[in-house]
Design a protein with these regions (language model features):
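Conserved SAM-binding loop of SAM-dependent methyltransferases across substrates and taxa
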Residues: 27-39
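S-adenosyl-L-methionine
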Residues: 1, 14-17, 52-80
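A short SAM/SAH-binding and catalytic strip from SAM-dependent methyltransferases
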Residues: 80-96
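Conserved class I S-adenosyl-L-methionine
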Residues: 19-26
Length: 157
């Protein structure tokens, strides 16, 4: 798990988000790291003890943008205001989640998927190492436009 977190951070170092969400935030380590880097960060998790643990752990941080942890269904939470979406989901969730991402994300947004790929999206970058694999995506409409113009996304450097 620690190896997965490090790979996700490596991928995110290629991004310059202003507002990040971690879907399936678990113990909150990705959200904490984002908050320490001065990003606005939100974690969404169904497991109430993990939400409480994350809130307690982050309450000790001295961050400009205090991280938020929400106990809610990630398929019901609006993603329209986020620049970067981090997903540590289960395989069966990836297909319904990609439809939600396509419908709600703005064109400059980025998606970092950990462990499981989005089945119908084309990744723009990847770190492949077995179960610790990470993929970087852009919403399909934005990726198609960039391919036509040869442009790069504004959301990463």
């Amino acid at each position: 798990m620690k190896n997965q977190t490090m790979k996700s951070h490596t991928m995110k170092n290629r991004l310059t988000p202003s507002h990040q969400i971690d879907l399936g935030s678990g113990d909150g380590r990705i959200v904490r790291e984002a908050a320490l880097r001065l990003y606005q960060a939100t974690g969404v998790e169904l497991n109430w003890p993990l939400v409480l643990y994350s809130r307690l752990t982050c309450s000790r941080l001295n961050c400009i943008h205090r991280p938020k942890f929400l106990r809610t269904d990630l398929l019901r939470h609006s993603l329209s205001t986020y620049d970067v979406v981090v997903i540590f989901g289960v395989k069966s969730l990836m297909k319904p989640l990609q439809a939600k991402l396509a419908a709600e994300l703005h064109p400059d947004a980025c998606v970092v998927a950990c462990r499981y790929r989005l089945p119908d999206w084309r990744h723009v970058d990847q770190i492949i190492e077995g179960v610790d694999s990470v993929w970087l995506y852009r919403p399909p409409a934005a990726a198609a436009a960039a391919a036509r113009t040869g442009g790069a996304a504004r959301a990463w450097s």
